């Protein structure tokens, strides 16, 4: 199967898949499978992330997949497919997370890696469980306005602020090989980062990122992660809401879109084994700019996967 050629069919035509990739609902033997996770039952504020995968795919036809001054296109280097969406109940979070974990585990038994597009961040715990099942305790690069290492709220076990706490508690993550970038804003309690820091996670706040810059932060990531299998999770709210307004919990003072894309180039120096781009809520977007950025982030991650796993780059 091949991508839809934009010189044959205009970019606004045909049924939208991520970056016009072929659709294969039962993928086998691919380098990276793109999978949608349309769910927002873990959202604590503004809903709408369940519509994120649909919006991202719709805008992703804009992106060709051949970067300037990069030589061969991403899809000339790795074999990718869009497998559609995971069928997730909107009524029960425990069932949704279990369903996502089972589906993602199945993908990794037949394919090398996945890029999950969401959907709220609660589903990342399902991804971590699936990837750790294959690779053991993971290094993690986590871009977000929030640490997402909160305890459970409102009597439930999960929400979109808990995935990395579960990941550390369940030993899916090696916290000594985890870096969080872009953390900022207001929190319910002054000890909101104590859990992450107390377990050895390197937290780079948005203010510290401003001091380190892209290069200094990338060096820190390379040093912390090394060549361990690494999962990369991007919450779109890491970006300043001036550039990514379409999200559920926006936080002013974030990174520029250009800074995020530049920082992700260091992923090609690592050993990536899975990705997600989460928390796009198109209900609050303007002109599709958040979904376009989410596509660019996904495209960058796919290219960096190719760079990490293909020696000719």
Swiss-Prot record:
Signal peptide region: none
Entry superkingdom: Bacteria
GO molecular function per UniProt: agmatinase activity; metal ion binding; proclavaminate amidinohydrolase activity
Pfam families in UniProt: Arginase (PF00491)
Gene3D superfamilies: Ureohydrolase domain
BP-aspect Gene Ontology terms: clavulanic acid biosynthetic process; putrescine biosynthetic process from arginine, via agmatine
EC number: 3.5.3.22
Chemical reaction(s) catalysed: amidinoproclavaminate + H2O = proclavaminate + urea
Subunit-structure text: Homohexamer.
Record's protein name: Proclavaminate amidinohydrolase
């Amino acid at each position: 199967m091949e991508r839809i050629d934009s010189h044959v069919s205009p970019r606004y035509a045909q049924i939208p898949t991520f970056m016009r990739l072929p659709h294969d609902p039962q993928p086998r033997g691919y380098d990276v499978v793109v999978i949608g996770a349309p769910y927002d039952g873990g959202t604590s504020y503004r809903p709408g992330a369940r519509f994120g995968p649909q919006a991202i795919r719709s805008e992703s036809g804009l992106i060709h997949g051949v970067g300037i001054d990069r030589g061969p296109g991403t899809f000339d280097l790795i074999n990718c497919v869009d497998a559609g969406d995971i069928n997730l109940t909107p009524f029960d979070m425990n069932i949704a997370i279990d369903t996502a974990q089972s589906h993602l585990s199945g993908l990794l038994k037949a394919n090398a890696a996945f890029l999950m597009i969401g959907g709220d961040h609660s589903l990342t715990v399902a991804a971590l469980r699936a990837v750790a099942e294959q690779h053991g305790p993971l290094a993690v690069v986590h871009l977000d306005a929030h640490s997402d290492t909160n305890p459970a709220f409102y009597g439930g076990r999960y929400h979109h602020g808990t995935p990395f706490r579960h990941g550390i508690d369940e030993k899916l993550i090696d916290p000594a090989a985890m870096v969080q970038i872009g953390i900022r804003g207001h929190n319910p309690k002054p000890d909101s980062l104590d859990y992450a820091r107390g377990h050895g996670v390197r937290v780079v706040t948005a203010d510290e990122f401003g001091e380190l810059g892209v290069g200094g932060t990338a060096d820190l990531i390379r040093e912390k992660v090394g060549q361990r299998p690494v999962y990369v999770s991007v919450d779109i709210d890491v970006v300043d809401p001036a550039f990514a307004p379409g999200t559920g919990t926006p936080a002013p003072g974030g990174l520029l879109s250009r800074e995020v894309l530049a920082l992700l180039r260091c992923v090609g120096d690592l050993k990536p084994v899975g990705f997600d781009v989460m928390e796009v809520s198109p209900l609050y977007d303007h002109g599709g700019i958040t979904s376009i950025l989410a596509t660019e982030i996904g495209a960058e991650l796919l290219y960096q996967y190719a760079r990490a796993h293909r020696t000719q780059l």
